[in-house]
Structure formats: structure tokens, C-alpha cells
A protein has these predicted regions:
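Membrane-interface alpha helices of multi-pass inner-membrane proteins
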Residues: 387, 421-437, 442-448, 482
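Short acidic/glycine- and proline-prone juxtamembrane loop motifs at membrane-interface regions
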Residues: 391-398
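Transmembrane-helix signature of polytopic, membrane-embedded enzymes
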Residues: 216-220, 340-343, 364-383
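Membrane-lumen/periplasm interface segments of multi-pass, membrane-embedded glycan/lipid transferases
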Residues: 187-191, 460-543, 552-647
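Beta-sheet-rich sandwich/jelly-roll-like modules and their strand-loop junctions
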Residues: 9-12, 21-100, 116-137, 143-201
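Transmembrane-helix motifs of polytopic, lipid-linked glycan transferases
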Residues: 347-370
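Interfacial juxtamembrane loops and adjacent helix segments
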Residues: 259-348
Length: 751
């Protein structure tokens, strides 16, 4: 029952929203403060001279150490190795000035004797960094400015190292100080970046609580809250750190070049890029850490863009693009037309991808039956979909399309389709087919729609071979044919590669035979469906045929290919991985070994798969393991289960019947099996667990899993909890963003 909007509800909701925004703002400030204490003002040093064998005391006039700098080289300070001759001094001050060739002081740094220890390096940070405009030689002037208790020495080499001469009292000391350049410094960036996230985080919390309190339409909630959280992921995820983002960048960039009528690759298949973009194209994930955040922020502000002229050859290969990259490519195209620099272009491409995902997600929530809108809203606002949407990943658009198709099929299960819904069903089914190979089984959801709901003004039409069929059945067949045809055109090469060690002609004949048998079974079912005795005979015969086909198929496939000689089994790459992977032939010929690998994988990677579905593991988990608190994962699981609970007094019959539920379960299992087979194709045969399998691959069928939970009615809620669950999911997503930023910023490479 729709509740009336009262002034009291508006005031209470506004106050609660302001309180939530204030709490999130304070929490964000705390994260910045904590990070500043832990990783703020942390320098990075580069060795300039590590050869030191003697001690030179600092004379009254000080020491003058020449420092050659290259054009563009930045110096934040330096670090020197002191000697106190075994003493512990309590008084004295050492100055380190950076001077030009004329002795003009460019930068200054000071150090207290109390912080200088015998035979230890001591850092001196300048007030501001110095960047050489051109190649030049500067000097470090090291001297005392107040009385000190005793002699203070500096370790130096015997003999001058390179062009780094040392002068003491105007005389060449024939030495070079033990010296390290301070090449970078985290400064106040940890707190500054956190403070920059605070307004958007506070707005997301404010909007979520306000819309919940006002009981706003769920599509509006997904649009507003999803946009705020997605833009936060755009900012929090470091450049090229999202899953496979460097590959997606190359594909989207290539498509953007084609949209502009440009030649995207050279004769060797390497991607052509703008001169200003070339340094950022590679074949590995980007860097993380506070210094990576800092470098990205400074580059976005200061780095020059350039004209849209593809004059540089990158390391990335062309030929990875598809229609799934269209939103990202449009963002890149517009940024290049405007002459934007690389990081501005990257952020714009991410934003376009986010907007396209949100359009599809909002459409899915709007299309879904009223009882399922809250459930779909919860899934759409999970951290993982928003993280993918806030990157260059084409999986975001695939997610949106599958969500829309699922919602439309469930919608048409309970109502008669109008003309635009029929067109949308065919279009979405055709789009889901080639979107990603493993999601083809989802197209079968069109069979949960009763034929009567798809029948048009003319109930019967002429089909293939002049057969008289119902128009609704023709629509379902059109969806299957379109999706299957586009799937084959998009994935035939990958399918041939997976079956590379099998007789592909026999496989093709077998596939055609299976299709013809299915068509025969469908025709026979139409003939006997109204005769109970004949229908039982058909089902019995079909069960026997399936059992014989499975046994015979396994025996046939296990002898068709996949055999490797002993010397072939020993062939490995330099890193120790076998050069052979689990092809279809190898899988069929080695079913016990495949089963053992899968059984070992489940306990080893099961928790990571769940994290991948929810989004509590960030970035590319194969490269960086950025895992937020398991408490957030528990909160997200509980929120999803709450959204899936049926309402106790709900009088309407379940959305899925028993037989339909088994069919949906079969679709889920087919998608899971397909993803495992694909991951096996990436896995070397000497691995003990799967390689490359990630939980996010199962995210498109998560609505179906929760739909089965909702239909069980084993546990019921007194009232609909989906709106509160969506608010809880939003809260967990915001906390994931905050902790994710903290983990990204504080990450340190393993030494």
C-alpha cells in the first residue's frame, strides 16, 4: 500500500539524511587523518652515490657537493650519512642549502644534532620541491649555523664519483659524499585526497537516506545513489588498476580511433596513439599507493594533452575491440577531440561507461515486477557492479543487458506483452548472446514466459517449411536464433581454440545433430502434450536417450583427442608453467584429473569468488590483493538475503513455479559450468587449482539465485525488507569505498 507523503516524514527524512551525511563526512576526515599519521610526509630516496670509505669533517665554511640534474628531474631533498665520531650530541644545527652555480640559494633544509646519529643516514627535506627546467649542475651547501659540541663528519668516497665533485674550504676534496636524492614525498596528500572524497561520499549518504525515508521510486534511488557511488569508484580506483583495464583501454582507444575515421594500428598490429598518451600504454596493470595517487592527481592538473594525431606506436596490440566498448570509446573520442591529457581522457571514458551501466540498471529495475525491484536495486548497487562500471570494463554493459533481459522475462511472465516489449525482448536477447560467451544460457529465460503472453493480434502464423505455429512461440524462437547466430559469429574462433585438439568436423556434425534432435523432441512434445499416456512414454524415452547420449558422448569425446606424450607433458615455460592448458580434448581424456583440480579449487578459492561477486576485493586480484573487511562482506550477504525474503502475508502465487524453478536452476548451473570450462582453458595442466576464475563472472545470474531463494518461502518476513536492504547495501558500498581508498593509498610493495 502506497504511503502518503507527509510534512513530518519529509522533515524526519531530511534530518536523518543530514545526520548520515555528517557521520560519513567525519568518518572520511578520520580516514584522512589516520592515513596522514601513517603514510604522510614519507620520502622516497634514490641512491646518487653509495661508495663511501672515509670521513670528512664539516669545516667552518661548510662542504660544497655538486649535484647534476637532468631536465625535468625533481628534488625534494637529500639524505647524507653522518659520523659523530662515536659521540652523542645534544646541541647544534646543520643546514643543507640547494644553490645554483652562482651560489644563490634555491631551497633550504635544516637538521638538529639531536636527530643525527653515528654512522646513520639523515634526511633533509626542502620546503618545496625543486624541478630542473633544463639539464644543470647545482650544489648542496652543508654547514653549521650554531655552536656545536664537537666535530661532525660526513662519509665520502675516495676519489670523485662521476661529475659529483666535493669542495671543502675552497679546495677540491677529491671525494663525493655518500648521497641519496629525495625523489618523492607523500606530503599531505593522504589527507588532501581523503578530504576531496568527503563531499561526494556525504552526498551519497544523504541521498540514500533521504530517498529511503521518502520512499522514492527505486529506479530513482538506483540512478542517484548509483551515480554518486560510481563516481567515487572512478576516483578511488587508481589508473589502469581495475580488472584487465590496460587491455580494455587499448580496445576502447582502438574503437575510438575507428569512430574518428583514423587508422588505429601500424603494419605490425601495434596500436597507434597520441604522442602524449604513449607513455601510459603498456601490458601490465597500473601502480597503486599514495605516490601513485599523487602522480595521477598532478598529471591530471599539469600534464599536457595534444592534438588527435596518432603519431606514436605503443606496446599494446590492436584487434581487441568490440561493440561492448562503445560507451568508453565515445568518452575517449570526445576527450581526444578536446585535446585532453591522458588522465582526463581516462576519467571521462570511465564516466561514460558508468552512465551507460546506470541507464541499463535503472531500466532493469523499472522493468522488473514490483516484488523484485528492491532485489534488483540491491544487486545493482553492490560494490562490484559499480567498480566495474567505474572502470573501462565492458562487463558493466554486459551486466546491465543481462539484468534488463532477466527483468523483462520476469515481467512478461505475469502480463501480456505489448509491441514494444516484444521488440525489446528480441533486441535484448540478441544483445546478451554475443555479449560474453558464458552467458548464452541466460537467453533460455524466454521460455519462462507463457506463449499466451507473447501472442499478437494473429494467434497463428506460418513458420518455417509452412508449419502453422503460434506467434508467441515464433517470438521465442526468434530470440534463440538471433542470440545463437550472433553468439557463433562472436565466439567461433574461441570455440575452435578450446577444441583445438579434437576432430572439429565431428563436433560440428554432433552439434547439428543435437539441434535437430531437440527440434524433433519439441515437435513430438507438441503432438503428445495433451495425451498423458503418450507424454509419459515420450519422457521415458527421452530420459533413456539422454542417459545413453551422456555415456556415449563421454566415451567418444575421451577418445577423440587431448592425449599428450610423456615428453610433451614435461614442456614448460621459463616460469615453470606447462605450455599446455586444459583444452576440451584434454578435459574429456583426463576427467579424474580435472575433477581433482576443481575439488582442490573450491576450498582454496571459494571465499575469493564470494568476494568477487560482492565486490569486497578491489582492483585486479591476480595482481594486487586489496581485500576490505570481511564484516562488510557479511553485511552485504545479509542485506541480499533480506531483500530476497518473501513477505509472509503476500497472497499472490510465487513468481516461479516448481518446474520453472528447476529450469532456472539449470540455467544457473550451465553458466557456472561454462565459466569453469573457460577458466580451465586458461589453466596450465601442471596447476593444482584453477587460474583466472573470478566470482564477478557469476554476478549476472545472482538475481536468479536470489529469485529461487525468494520462491522457497522457507523463511518469510512480516513486511517487505528490500528498501531497507538497498540502504544497507549502499552503506556497505560507501564503507568499501572508504576502506578501499585507505588500502590502495597505504599499499607497500613486498620486498
Amino acid at each position: 500500500m502506497k504511503q502518503k507523503l507527509t510534512l513530518r516524514r519529509v522533515l524526519v527524512s531530511t534530518v536523518a539524511a543530514l545526520a548520515a551525511a555528517a557521520a560519513v563526512w567525519l568518518l572520511c576526515r578520520w580516514v584522512g587523518y589516520d592515513l596522514q599519521l601513517r603514510i604522510g610526509n614519507e620520502p622516497v630516496y634514490e641512491i646518487a652515490n653509495d661508495d663511501y670509505t672515509r670521513i670528512i669533517d664539516v669545516p667552518e665554511d661548510g662542504l660544497w657537493q655538486t649535484v647534476p640534474l637532468e631536465a625535468g628531474q625533481t628534488l625534494y631533498g637529500c639524505r647524507l650519512r653522518f659520523s659523530t665520531h662515536g659521540e652523542l650530541y645534544r646541541a647544534g644545527m646543520v643546514m643543507v642549502d640547494l644553490c645554483d652555480a652562482d651560489g644563490t640559494i634555491l631551497r633550504e633544509a635544516a637538521g638538529n644534532y639531536a636527530n643525527i646519529f653515528d654512522d646513520n643516514f639523515t634526511g633533509f627535506a626542502f620546503g618545496t620541491a625543486y624541478t630542473a627546467a633544463q639539464a644543470e649542475t647545482l650544489c648542496l651547501h652543508i654547514y653549521n649555523v650554531v655552536e656545536w659540541e664537537g666535530p661532525l663528519g660526513l662519509w665520502a668516497s675516495t676519489g670523485t664519483v662521476g661529475a659529483m665533485s666535493l669542495t671543502a674550504d675552497g679546495v677540491d676534496a677529491d671525494a663525493t659524499l655518500a648521497l641519496q636524492y629525495m625523489t618523492d614525498d607523500s606530503g599531505s596528500w593522504p589527507s588532501d585526497l581523503a578530504n576531496g572524497l568527503a563531499p561526494l561520499l556525504a552526498f551519497a549518504a544523504f541521498a540514500a537516506v533521504l530517498l529511503f525515508g521518502l520512499r522514492a521510486p527505486l529506479p530513482l534511488t538506483v540512478a542517484v545513489v548509483g551515480l554518486a557511488c560510481g563516481l567515487l569508484f572512478v576516483r578511488v580506483t587508481p589508473a589502469l588498476v581495475a580488472p584487465d583495464e590496460y587491455t580494455h583501454l587499448a580496445a576502447a582507444y582502438e574503437l575510438a580511433s575507428r569512430l574518428g575515421g583514423e587508422t588505429p594500428a601500424d603494419e605490425n598490429g601495434c596500436l597507434l596513439v597520441r604522442e602524449s598518451d604513449a607513455p601510459h600504454f603498456g601490458t601490465r596493470s597500473g601502480e597503486i599507493g599514495i605516490l601513485a595517487y599523487k602522480a595521477e592527481a598532478l598529471a591530471r592538473q599539469k600534464e599536457a594533452g595534444g592534438p588527435d594525431a596518432l603519431t606514436a606506436v605503443s606496446e599494446a596490440k590492436a584487434g581487441q575491440g568490440s561493440g561492448n566498448y562503445l560507451p568508453q570509446a565515445v568518452g575517449i573520442r570526445l576527450a581526444r577531440n578536446a585535446g585532453a591529457n591522458f588522465y582526463t581522457m581516462l576519467r571521462q571514458a570511465r564516466t561514460f561507461n558508468l552512465i551507460f551501466y546506470l541507464l541499463l540498471a535503472v531500466l532493469a529495475v523499472a522493468l522488473a515486477p514490483a516484488a523484485l525491484r528492491g532485489l534488483l536495486a540491491c544487486i545493482a548497487l553492490l560494490p562490484m557492479p559499480l567498480q566495474l562500471a567505474g572502470s573501462l570494463s565492458p562487463d558493466a554493459s554486459v551486466l546491465g543487458m543481462v539484468f534488463c533481459y532477466t527483468a523483462l522475462c520476469l515481467r512478461l511472465r505475469t502480463k501480456k506483452a505489448v509491441w514494444w516489449e516484444k521488440i525489446l525482448l528480441i533486441a535484448l536477447g540478441g544483445a546478451v548472446g554475443p555479449a560474453k560467451a558464458i552467458y548464452l544460457p541466460v537467453v533460455l529465460l524466454c521460455f519462462i514466459i507463457p506463449v499466451d503472453n507473447l501472442v499478437g493480434p494473429t494467434e497463428f502464423v506460418r513458420g518455417s517449411f509452412g508449419v502453422r505455429v503460434r506467434s508467441g512461440q515464433l517470438i521465442r524462437e526468434a530470440v534463440l536464433v538471433l542470440a545463437g547466430g550472433l553468439w557463433l559469429s562472436a565466439n567461433l574462433g574461441e570455440l575452435a581454440y578450446a577444441a583445438r585438439d579434437m576432430n572439429q568436423m565431428l563436433l560440428a556434425v554432433g552439434a547439428v545433430g543435437i539441434v535437430l534432435l531437440l527440434a524433433l523432441v519439441r515437435w513430438l512434445y507438441g503432438k503428445v502434450q495433451n495425451d498423458a499416456k503418450k507424454l509419459r512414454l515420450l519422457k521415458g524415452a527421452l530420459a533413456c536417450a539422454v542417459a545413453l547420449a551422456v555415456v556415449g558422448g563421454v566415451l567418444a569425446l575421451s577418445r577423440m583427442g587431448g592425449g599428450l606424450a610423456p615428453d610433451q607433458l614435461l614442456m614448460t615455460n621459463p616460469n615453470g608453467d606447462s605450455i599446455w592448458t586444459f583444452s576440451l580434448g584434454y578435459i574429456c581424456r583426463n576427467l579424474p584429473a580435472t575433477a581433482k583440480l576443481l575439488l582442490r579449487t573450491i576450498p582454496a578459492q571459494g571465499a575469493l569468488w564470494l568476494q568477487g561477486i560482492l565486490g569486497t576485493t578491489l582492483g585486479e586480484p591476480i595482481v594486487y590483493r586489496i581485500d576490505v573487511s570481511w564484516l562488510l562482506g557479511v553485511g552485504l550477504v545479509l542485506a541480499l538475503l533480506a531483500a530476497a525474503l518473501p513477505v509472509q502475508d503476500e497472497q499472490s502465487k510465487p513468481l516461479l513455479g516448481r518446474r520453472t524453478g528447476f529450469g532456472v536452476l539449470g540455467i544457473i548451473l550451465c553458466v557456472a559450468a561454462s565459466s569453469l570450462v573457460v577458466a580451465l582453458n586458461w589453466t596450465p595442466i601442471n596447476y593444482e587449482t584453477l587460474f583466472g576464475m573470478q566470482g564477478r563472472y557469476w554476478l549476472p545470474v545472482l538475481p536468479l539465485v536470489l529469485l529461487l531463494v525468494k520462491g522457497s518461502r522457507s523463511v518469510c518476513a512480516r513486511r517487505d525488507l528490500s528498501r531497507g536492504a538497498a540502504l544497507a547495501v549502499t552503506a556497505c558500498t560507501l564503507l568499501t569505498l572508504l576502506q578501499g581508498y585507505s588500502l590502495y593509498a597505504s599499499w607497500q610493495p613486498v620486498s
